[in-house]
């Protein structure tokens, strides 16, 4: 699915883990147009759950998948092994075991994992892991978006997002700017 119509990069951050505040960051590229959107959210609390890095990572994927048209192929790229493994490998066993881990404990973050599973059921999603802080320009931008959201400050803007997408050849260079929206 390397030619998925949508590529979604996501990252999450908790300044104090657990406890927060936390933030999410994402960039979604629509290869068919080309167009993209990006953004992030600051989380001071997360309902009855503590703000954690893993919850922010999962929430970032949810935000990235929000609004994508059903039936489309999406590649989600994350530097979180937890996200990639939870959503592509472990989820199948957890469902069979009544949302229990191999050791019999309740699955942490079940609410978000089930929400992502429901959203992904309308799409064809592939989860891909990349090493964080290893020269992946778009991954660095989503990390900066998540960190900025957690701190409650402005993060990278459109110029930085476009530069990162071009650096990794997701967008061609040239004078015509692709359509964008900041979430």
Swiss-Prot record:
Example GO molecular function: RNA-DNA hybrid ribonuclease activity
First-listed, main subcellular location of the protein, grouped into a coarse class: cytoplasm
Entry superkingdom: Bacteria
Residues annotated to bind Mg(2+) 2: 11, 143
Classification via InterPro entries: RNase_H, RNaseH-like_sf, RNaseH_domain, RNaseH_sf, RNaseHI
Cofactor note as given: Binds 1 Mg(2+) ion per subunit. May bind a second metal ion at a regulatory site, or after substrate binding.
Protein task: Endonuclease that specifically degrades the RNA of RNA-DNA hybrids.
Protein name: Ribonuclease H
Organism: Anaeromyxobacter dehalogenans (strain 2CP-1 / ATCC BAA-258)
């Amino acid at each position: 699915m390397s030619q998925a119509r949508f590529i979604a990069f996501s990252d999450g951050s908790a300044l104090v883990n657990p406890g927060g505040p936390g933030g999410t960051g994402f960039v979604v590229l629509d290869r068919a147009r080309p167009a993209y959107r990006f953004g992030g959210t600051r989380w001071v609390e997360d309902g009855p759950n503590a703000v954690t890095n893993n919850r922010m990572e999962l929430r970032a994927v949810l935000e990235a998948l929000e609004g994508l048209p059903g039936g489309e192929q999406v590649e989600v790229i994350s530097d979180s092994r937890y996200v990639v493994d939870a959503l592509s490998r472990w989820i199948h066993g957890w469902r069979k075991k009544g949302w229990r881990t191999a050791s019999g404990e309740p699955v942490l973050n079940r609410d978000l994992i089930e929400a992502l599973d429901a959203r992904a059921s309308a799409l064809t999603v592939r989860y891909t892991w990349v090493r964080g802080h290893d020269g992946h320009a778009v991954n660095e931008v989503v990390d900066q978006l998540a960190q900025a959201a957690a701190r409650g400050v402005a993060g990278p803007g459109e110029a930085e997002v476009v530069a990162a997408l071009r650096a990794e050849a997701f967008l061609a260079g040239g004078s015509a700017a692709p359509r964008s929206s900041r979430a």
